[in-house]
Swiss-Prot record:
Record-linked InterPro entries: EF-Ts_dimer_sf, Transl_elong_EFTs/EF1B, Transl_elong_EFTs/EF1B_dimer, UBA-like_sf
Keyword Oxidoreductase carried by entry: no
Entry's localization field: Mitochondrion
Name assigned to this protein: Elongation factor Ts, mitochondrial
Stated family: Belongs to the EF-Ts family.
Organism this protein belongs to: Leishmania major
Additional note from the record: This protein may be expected to contain an N-terminal transit peptide but none has been predicted.
Cited CDD domains: UBA_EF-Ts
One GO location term (cellular component): cytoplasm
Length: 276
């Protein structure tokens, strides 16, 4: 019985059979072919043990690369399931633009987005009260996924920052949140620039289409460098309607906006307090 068990883990003499094992291990771990081959030889063909070997090596590589400079990447839009859960923009970095465009990097961005949204929902938005602590917590929760990504990409990858959208306290009833992402590689909510907006619904129980909210987010992305009162600017794509008029016609009031372009400081607009 012991002989049969060991035989199951022996490296196949047939090269074709061995390469099938390598192919399977690479599919499961996304590690380089050379690493998969070496791990299988080291463990006599034991697939589970080979995965453990790759995991340890990936962790070691991640530690070595952990201090390397990360100057490229993408920003990610994270919107909770309810306005009370909040919204934020996460910046995720790599060492090169080539790695940031990699499918695995983009997939980890989506995983980070999903994880932060879960945390926002579970804490009713409280996790965003301290952005620096939120980065640490999110990095800890995503530690294994980040280690694997570093091993696959051969570069450092990290969550750099979280910028929360903060609605104006005096315009916070019946809130709706809109999001717009620019410069995406066909991955939802992951791009070069993200715009978030908080809007207050004037008429209760009226359904506001998602594309209306997205349009407001797009406006602030397109005009993020503009100076002056945002309410008096022409709404993006319109030559006759100002932002204030466009929102009023749709039963909305502006509360706040947040635009984050990768590598730049966030641009924030907040509704002014009414004159007393």
């Amino acid at each position: 019985m012991l002989h049969r068990s060991l035989a199951c883990f022996a490296v196949p003499a047939d090269r074709k059979a061995f390469m099938e094992l390598v192919k399977t291990l690479r599919y499961r771990t996304e590690a380089p072919i050379s690493d998969c081959s070496a791990a299988l030889k080291e463990t006599d063909g034991d697939m589970d043990a080979a995965m453990q070997v790759l995991r340890k090596r990936g962790a070691a590589r991640a530690m070595k690369k952990g201090d390397r400079v990360t100057e490229h990447g993408f920003v990610v839009s994270c919107v909770g399931s309810t306005p009370q859960s909040g919204a934020a923009i996460v910046t995720i970095c790599s060492e090169t633009d080539f790695a940031a465009r990699n499918e695995h990097f983009q997939r980890v961005c989506m995983q980070v987005r999903d994880q932060l949204c879960k945390l926002m929902d579970a804490t009713n938005g409280a996790v965003l009260a301290n952005p620096e602590e939120a980065v640490k917590h999110l990095s800890d929760v995503m530690a294994e996924e980040l280690r694997v990504a570093i091993a696959v990409l051969g570069e450092n990858m990290r969550v750099r920052s979280i910028a929360p959208l903060v609605p104006a306290p005096h315009v916070s009833e019946r809130l709706l949140i809109g999001s717009y992402t620019h410069g995406s590689l066909n991955v939802d909510n992951v791009g070069r620039i993200v715009g978030l907006v908080a809007l207050s619904q004037v008429r209760e129980n009226e359904v506001v289409p998602k594309d209306v909210l997205t349009s407001v987010g797009r406006h602030f992305v397109a005009t993020s460098g503009a100076e002056g009162n945002y309410a008096h600017q022409n709404f993006f794509g319109s030559e006759t309607e100002t932002v204030g008029k466009w929102l009023k016609q749709r039963g909305l009031k502006f509360s706040s906006s947040l635009v984050q372009e990768f590598g730049k400081e966030p641009v924030v607009h907040t509704a002014p307090e009414p004159h007393r």
